[in-house]
């Protein structure tokens, strides 16, 4: 885990979007791999947990484990501030997630992941900050975010 993750924009293939929307969100969590832009899908299968590594819409590897704690070290969804959610929703953005990332030193850092649908599914991440509000602010100020916001969905 690096100290800073620059904002990135990635467009997922249609197959991956279809795969995500077909899943039961209550039992799964998703994150976009930083370097490889790999999508990790964590699923509970019976009494076991399965992590699938999906790259460009294709399953490239999978692992199973008996304990959720073995996967918990990756990314854990947290509750998103309502004011930020309302802002994104009013501007035509479909979803905002704040993800708590746990590094090797077990310190909690935050970054914002925005999912926008405007002809394609776009995932954008902010820089890593010490608090959720700082992460949101850093994303709002980024050139990448402003470029997407200027092309928001009409409503």
PLM regions with names:
Residues 16-28, 32, 37-129:
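N-terminal segment of the canonical double-stranded RNA-binding domain
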